[in-house]
Amino acid sequence: YHKMYYHKLNSTQSEDKLVYGGEKEPNRYVSGSVTEDQNYLQIYAGQNTSGRQLYIKDLITPNSKPVKIQGDYFARADVLYNKKRTFYLFTNIDAPNGRIVSVNLSKPNIWKDVVPESENVMFASSGGGYLFVRYLVDAKSQIMQYDLNGEIVREIDLPGIGSAYGFNAKEDEKDLYYS
């Protein structure tokens, strides 16, 4: 049984607190990370390589329980960015080519399209408070910058034909790098 624990530095292991996993969630591999603002824990739980569940735990509210955002083991929903309790997810749910949705923790079953699926395969990232989408168009990358409402800010001009990767940065950063 995979488990995720909270460990406070300079404390003993016996004081660790179980956050997720164990006998109630058998046969899952578990991973997690903290959001950039350090206020939320993203918990991913999977049983295969086709997808994984997503839970988000509020780290500010004492004794909060993880909120299930996505419960399908054969789909993906990855956190790109959060603005307080609103999370921007890249998902393949109802979108084989990918889409970006927003979800508020107070209403985790209500997903709103931010950047809908297109005819081209999509990959997504965030940086500087924006969303970046890399579309695969005619075997080359096309990069679009979106605001958090899904409005196109601009197309990123690339120096030539090829594949571009990267476009990740922290919220307050004004520069980002790609290859």
Predicted regions and their residues:
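Peripheral, non-catalytic segments that deliver or gate enzyme domains
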Residues: 1-179
